[in-house]
């Protein structure tokens, strides 16, 4: 049974990028604590799988496909939320794009646009639409998934690192302007986590070893280890936490 501080019973939560990895674990943990979770990602069948697993575990969930890089998709999902639920208590911006892994000088315009459209523009306009609903109800919590690359740019991850640094400042800007409206925004900065999204780092032995040599815990994280921080940030336990960017990296950035 959920404890009082972390109880999300009756809350409506939207988690993007929730069909796998960190997003999937966030969606499942929020549901375990009582939230009704809207599982969102680009492919409806992947979202439905996660929603079905939540429901099978006696949780509340539904699937809704949304490509956050497309403004029309953002408008559609929030029209649905407003019509079907009339409120949104929690938004977790977790969808991300990292199409290019290589030297920064070789970044092409296609990779640049795709990364910026999802990681910056997508987060920005998802937050605006969520913020409008939350302003009406006088409360809400938004969490952005950034990255330790926002603090220490990753080798051969230039444009991705740049967008995640933007997410950190976006978090602080929204927190400052929306705090008076009862809306909190914080960010999670994961370290090296075993996901399909980060597969390029695990497949390159030299890069993986360089990470292991610099992480004091001498291991990578599992997706579930990121979800707990998000639960804290969206719960009453963090009711006075606003504009914070919490690093969960095994000590990498010490």
Language model regions located:
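Conserved glycine-rich cofactor-binding loop
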Residues: 12, 19-20
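The beta1-alpha1 cofactor-binding region of Rossmann-like NAD(H)/NADP(H)-dependent oxidoreductases
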Residues: 44, 65-77, 109
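Substrate-binding pocket helix/loop in short-chain dehydrogenase/reductase
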Residues: 102-104, 108-113, 211
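C-terminal substrate-recognition "lid" of short-chain dehydrogenase/reductases
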Residues: 124, 219-248, 253
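Active-site helix of classical SDR
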Residues: 127, 163, 171
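Residue(s) in the substrate-gating loop at a strand-loop-helix junction
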Residues: 147
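Short, small/polar-rich loop/turn modules that mediate ligand/substrate recognition or access, typified
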Residues: 179, 184, 241-243
């Amino acid at each position: 049974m959920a404890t009082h501080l972390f109880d999300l019973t009756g809350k409506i939560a939207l988690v993007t990028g929730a069909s796998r990895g960190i997003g999937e674990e966030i969606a499942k943990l929020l549901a375990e604590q009582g939230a009704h979770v809207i599982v969102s990602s680009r492919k409806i069948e992947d979202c439905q799988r996660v929603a079905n697993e939540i429901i099978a575990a006696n949780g509340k969930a539904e699937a809704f496909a949304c490509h956050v890089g497309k403004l029309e998709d953002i408008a559609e999902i929030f029209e649905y939320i407003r019509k079907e639920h009339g409120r949104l208590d929690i938004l977790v911006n977790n969808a991300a794009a990292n199409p290019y892994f290589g030297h920064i000088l070789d970044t092409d315009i296609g990779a640049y646009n795709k990364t910026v459209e999802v990681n910056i523009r997508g987060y920005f306009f998802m937050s605006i639409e969520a913020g409008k609903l939350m302003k009406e109800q006088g409360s809400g919590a938004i969490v952005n998934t950034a990255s330790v690359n926002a603090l220490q740019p990753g080798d051969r991850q230039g444009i991705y690192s740049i967008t995640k640094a933007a997410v950190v400042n976006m978090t602080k800007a929204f927190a400052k302007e929306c705090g008076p409206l009862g809306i909190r925004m914080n960010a999670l900065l994961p370290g090296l986590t075993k996901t399909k999204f980060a597969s390029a780092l695990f497949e390159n032995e030299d890069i993986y070893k360089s990470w292991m040599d610099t992480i004091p815990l001498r291991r990578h994280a599992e997706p579930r280890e990121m979800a707990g921080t998000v639960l804290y940030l969206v719960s009453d336990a963090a009711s006075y936490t606003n504009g914070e960017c919490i690093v969960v990296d095994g000590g990498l950035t010490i």
